Each structure stands twice: as structure tokens, then as C-alpha cells.
């Protein structure tokens, strides 16, 4: 059963969240953190799979996404920046933990949500997580990020809340280049044409992000790649990196392996990685999604 939750944002307005409730007493909590230009109900199939296994699942629409687009109507913008959006995710975690204090707690972040999850690991090492799953992540060349952030900062001086097609093209424009005979500009998401078509058709998906959000995301990525922040993580926390071998965000497994390697260099004691050949960005929505679901389940259950 899925229910809606609302709470005050640390930025502005109200945050919408969903809770998927299993039958009987839950055995653990899984908190999902979604990606850019999407919303939590897209994870309904995965969440329902987890509830059938006895998990309580929670997830919030980030500011400017899903039903958390408030009265100002601004989509794809974080009022207060990256760390304010992180605080909204942390508030859901705190509220859920307060209600279910004895349950193991697993964090799952996808795409932009993977960068948010990694921020939480670096910034809040004592938040009481049992395990973390980092899905569809990447690693950016650290030397290039400050220059890129400076360029975007200049654009933001005009109006950081407005959608910016040019910046969006800089960040995402090359993602389809390795897809043979693409039908749409979003074929890089999944080999499942129905998933891609539903994404394109939905008004809450695939919109152009603001310059401010793209800047904030780059600042977040820069934060999670700094050595001192990586070393701040809870060294005993189990972490599972999963991604598609044909995911351009990775890119194509390389950045995922680099991220896992940097976690190990930072002293993380239990780091696993699984790259799914031929899978694109949204492995939870791929044609072999059931395989991914089962792998995630089996990995989580090792730590319960």
C-alpha cells in the first residue's frame, strides 16, 4: 500500500513523499532518492517488489520535482542549494527513524540521487545507516569541475531559476551518442521503449533544469569527490555500486569503478560493485529489471 506524506521543506514550500507499507511488521526501511527531472512514483514497481519482501519504503520528491513543485511553479530548482535539498532528504530519514527506531535502514540513491546519497555518506557518517546502494552514479574529473562551476555561476547571475537549454545540452547532450539508431533523445535511459515513451509523455519528467540546479549538482559532485570528505565516511558501512554498462552517466562503467576505487582508498571496508552489460542508465527500468531487483534484495539481506 502506498500513502502520501507532506512536510515542510528546509528551502521553501512543502515536500511530498511516499511511503510503501508491507503487510505485517516491516523488517527494514529502504529510503529511495530519485534523480533529476523525475518523481518518486516512477519507483512504484521497485518499491512494491521490496514491500512484498517485507520492507518499508520511503522516498520524497525533491524541491522543484514531482508534487514538491510549489506555488511558485518553478521546476528543477533547489531553493537554498544542494545542501538544503539534502536536508529535505535527511528530514524524511529522521522522521522515519523516529517512528521505526529499531529497524535497519538502507539508503538507495539513483543518478542525481546517487550523488545526494554520497553527500549524505560524507556529511552525516553517524546518521545510523545499515547499508547504502549507489545506482547509476559517475565520477567527474576534479580539475574540470571548478571551471565548469564558475561558468555556470556567471550564467546564474542573470536568473538561476529559469530553465537553461544550453547548459542542459552541455551536461546531457552527448548521452545518446552511443545508442545505435535512437528513436528519441532519451533512448539512453533504457532499452525498454515503453519506459522511454512513458518518460517523454509525462509532464513531470524530462523537463529542462534551471541553471541553478545544474550549478548546485556540480557543486555537490565536487564535494563528494574531495579526499577529506570521502575520508569522513563511516568506514564500516557496506556500500554497493550498481550501474549499466551502457550508461553514459557512468560513463559506461568507468566512473562507477573509479568511485568504488576511491571509496576503498578512503578506507571503506565493504565496497561491492556490479555492472550490468548492455544496460543503460535506469537499470531499475531495464528489460532485465527483475535481475537487478533480485540482486539488490540479496545484497541487502546479507546485512539484516
Tell what function each PLM region has.
Residues 42-72:
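Conserved alpha/beta-hydrolase
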Residues 78-97:
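Alpha/beta-hydrolase active-site loop
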Residues 266, 270-304:
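Catalytic active-site module of serine/aspartate enzymes centered on a nucleophile-bearing elbow/loop
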Residues 100-111:
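Alpha/beta-hydrolase fold nucleophile elbow
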Residues 1-24:
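N-terminal cap/lid segment of alpha/beta-hydrolase-fold proteins
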Residues 241-243:
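Short beta-strand/loop motif that positions the catalytic acidic residue
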Residues 34-38, 111, 245-246:
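Active-site glycine-rich loops that stabilize anionic/oxyanionic intermediates
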Residues 117-204:
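Alpha/beta-hydrolase-fold enzymes
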Amino acid at each position: 500500500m502506498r500513502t502520501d506524506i507532506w512536510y515542510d521543506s528546509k528551502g521553501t514550500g512543502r515536500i511530498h513523499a511516499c511511503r510503501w507499507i508491507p503487510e505485517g511488521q516491516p523488517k527494514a526501511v529502504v529510503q529511495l532518492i530519485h534523480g533529476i527531472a523525475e518523481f518518486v512514483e516512477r519507483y512504484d514497481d521497485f518499491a512494491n517488489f521490496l514491500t512484498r519482501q517485507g520492507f518499508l519504503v520511503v522516498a520524497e520528491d525533491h524541491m522543484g520535482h514531482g508534487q514538491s513543485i510549489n506555488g511558485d511553479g518553478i521546476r528543477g530548482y533547489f531553493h537554498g542549494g544542494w545542501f538544503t535539498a539534502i536536508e529535505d532528504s535527511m528530514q524524511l530519514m529522521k522522521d522515519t527513524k523516529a517512528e521505526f527506531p529499531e529497524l535497519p535502514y538502507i539508503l538507495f540513491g539513483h543518478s542525481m540521487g546517487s550523488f545526494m546519497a554520497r553527500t549524505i555518506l560524507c556529511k552525516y557518517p553517524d546518521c545510523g545507516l545499515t547499508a547504502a546502494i549507489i545506482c547509476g552514479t559517475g565520477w567527474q574529473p576534479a580539475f574540470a569541475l571548478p571551471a565548469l562551476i564558475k561558468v555556470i555561476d556567471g550564467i546564474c547571475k542573470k536568473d538561476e531559476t529559469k530553465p537553461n537549454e544550453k547548459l542542459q545540452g552541455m551536461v546531457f547532450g552527448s548521452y545518446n551518442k552511443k545508442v545505435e539508431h535512437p528513436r528519441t533523445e532519451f533512448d539512453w535511459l533504457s532499452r525498454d521503449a515503453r519506459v522511454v515513451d512513458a518518460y517523454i509523455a509525462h509532464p513531470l519528467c524530462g523537463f529542462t533544469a534551471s541553471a541553478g540546479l545544474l550549478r548546485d549538482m556540480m557543486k555537490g559532485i565536487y564535494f563528494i569527490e574531495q579526499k577529506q570528505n570521502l575520508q569522513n565516511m563511516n568506514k564500516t558501512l557496506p556500500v554497493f555500486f550498481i550501474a549499466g554498462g551502457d550508461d553514459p552517466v557512468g560513463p559506461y562503467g568507468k566512473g562507477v569503478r573509479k568511485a568504488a576505487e576511491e571509496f576503498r582508498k578512503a578506507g571503506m571496508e565493504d565496497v561491492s560493485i556490479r555492472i550490468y552489460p548492455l544496460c543503460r542508465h535506469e537499470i531499475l527500468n531495464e528489460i532485465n529489471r527483475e535481475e537487478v531487483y533480485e540482486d539488490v534484495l540479496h545484497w541487502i539481506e546479507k546485512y539484516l
